[in-house]
């Protein structure tokens, strides 16, 4: 997430992303999330202490939502770039910010592909 207090965001994962040279360089960011948003679900052993459990939960994001978003984006990426299914490439957002905005005409901007209307708030998708 963009509030990663372990690896850092601006001078950590974002900086690494910006320095990558791959042709298909993408990064999905959960806004206001810290470092501990994965893997999910938390293993049973982690419930023994609060310290261990803290590695698997984030105060801003529900793990079910995180899993669904990651599954959606991962499948779109793999289908597009590994399987060569170009129709699935359309599910990789073209617009960086997931937030939909209401215009002067009271109509909202389109949601990201594969997301219901007004359902993808708090995500950013970086392309390089």
Show which residues each predicted segment covers.
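Active-site-proximal beta-strand/loop segments in catalytic clefts of secreted hydrolases
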Residues: 1-3, 30-33
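Short N-terminal secondary-structure initiator segments
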Residues: 1-7, 121
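Conserved alpha/beta-hydrolase "acid-adjacent" motif
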Residues: 5-12, 38
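Conserved loop-alpha-helix segment in the C-terminal half of the alpha/beta-hydrolase fold
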Residues: 12-22
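Alpha/beta-hydrolase-fold serine-hydrolase catalytic core, especially in secreted/extracellular enzymes
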Residues: 22-23, 31-36, 41-128
């Amino acid at each position: 997430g963009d509030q990663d207090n372990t690896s850092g965001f601006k001078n950590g994962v974002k900086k690494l992303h910006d320095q990558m040279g791959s042709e298909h360089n993408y990064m999905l960011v959960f806004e206001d999330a810290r470092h501990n948003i994965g893997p999910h679900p938390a293993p049973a052993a982690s419930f023994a202490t609060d310290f261990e459990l803290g590695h698997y939960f984030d105060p801003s994001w529900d793990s079910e939502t995180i899993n669904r978003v990651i599954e959606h984006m991962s499948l779109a990426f793999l289908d597009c770039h590994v399987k060569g299914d170009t129709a699935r490439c359309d599910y990789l957002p073209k617009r960086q910010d997931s937030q939909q905005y209401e215009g002067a005409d009271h109509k909202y901007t389109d949601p990201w592909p594969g997301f219901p209307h007004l359902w993808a708030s708090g995500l950013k998708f970086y392309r390089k």
